[in-house]
Amino acid sequence: MKTSGRLLFLCLAVGLLLESQAHPIADAEDATRNVGSDGTSVELSEILERGQDSSAEKGQRQNDHDVDESGHDIPFPS
């Protein structure tokens, strides 16, 4: 009985540890991340627009792949 109690306690402790790691506590930076300059929340479209802008910039930086004569991408240049 003693061993099963210790095993149960160990499982509960590990479960609580994993649960606390899965949901980090929000800090002040997280609370103000989606707040606009006037103190209201930023619209979803603005957030998505910013994300698309940064994605486009990343795509332009990584757009140095090879293209054959017909204009098709060459997936693995030789």
Swiss-Prot record:
Tissue expression notes: Expressed by the venom duct.
Protein keywords: Pyrrolidone carboxylic acid, Secreted, Signal, Toxin
Record GO cellular component, one term: extracellular region
This protein's record includes keyword Signal: yes
Compartment list: Secreted
A GO MF term: toxin activity
Purpose: Probable toxin.
UniProt name for this protein: Conotoxin ba1890.8
Organism: Conus bayani
Taxonomy of the source species: Eukaryota, Metazoa, Spiralia, Lophotrochozoa, Mollusca
